[in-house]
């Protein structure tokens, strides 16, 4: 896990131009940053380098401009958010490469921080064009990647440049990689995984990878219905991908071969309409009526799943157990998340969670701060769970 270098290895950076890849792809409302979480994540790295006298040059993308300049996707729009979080003025350089970028960098002094323009304004970014990576490398002396959320992309600012300059992991990247290694790379066993969400089709590769790595696989959300159907359960009007029953059976077989126990709900909360607080029934999975939908895991199954977690030492969580955005179908997700949080607080469980819906669910349960690590990385977290190589990480190991 120490195959990559961190800021501990970077040496004297006084007066050095350090290109730092960060995640500034933040949500905006009425022209202002509405959630600065991603900016805040990069602050320890930015401050550390600035305090050590580096010239800190921030590289990032914003939106999907598809290789063309678009003023509605300029990083100038997020400057207010960056300055608010950092607590002082930051220079904006309206180019990322070329003479304009070089001129902007030339006026900076040690300790200064600047944001370069959206890297995706250049076709060479997403194409990982060697010429674009060369042009980026011309304006820096060192490279730091602090954007795990973009590490699954082989782009010029994540992969190409890391092979042209001395490359290091920033503090946020370092924390993420250590947490992920503790969860699946070299975990304390037994290991449990919670995988939820609406569709099996979006998580097939995750499930196939996990059955070979974890001891207990807890499947929830709409995707559990497909697995129940594969076991011969009539799930009524529930969301169910009947065309993937064979895939579900293949995953059952792979789990059996690997010694992984798959846990499905055996009691469920059903309703005839998917709406807030409708009339509901809690029934055995074999008692779902033809006009009912499964919308959450039932109380007996929640208790059994809590017992599974109590006997595990490591947990990876991706996706809610029920339709958590719509009460009362948040009950199972909240209850199991609070169990995991309590076990983490008492020191018996290492808990790592990730994915947009997962973060929202843990925040809803009020326990995101109690998990060992919560990743906001989305696609990169999912590809890591699938066991796929992450080009931005691999480039740091070169």
Curated annotation (Swiss-Prot):
Chief location: cytoplasm
GO cellular component: cytosol
EC number, UniProt record: 2.7.2.3
Family according to the record: Belongs to the phosphoglycerate kinase family.
Residue sites binding substrate per the record: 23-25, 38, 61-64, 120, 153
Protein name, per record: Phosphoglycerate kinase
Protein residues bound to ATP: 203, 325, 355-358
Entries under InterPro entries matching the protein: Phosphoglycerate_kinase (IPR001576), Phosphoglycerate_kinase_CS (IPR015911), Phosphoglycerate_kinase_N (IPR015824), Phosphoglycerate_kinase_sf (IPR036043)
Location(s) in or outside the cell: Cytoplasm
HAMAP family: Phosphoglyc_kinase
An example Gene Ontology biological process: gluconeogenesis
Signal peptide interval: none
Catalytic activity, reaction form: (2R)-3-phosphoglycerate + ATP = (2R)-3-phospho-glyceroyl phosphate + ADP
Superkingdom of origin: Bacteria
Organism: Sphingopyxis alaskensis (strain DSM 13593 / LMG 18877 / RB2256) (Sphingomonas alaskensis)
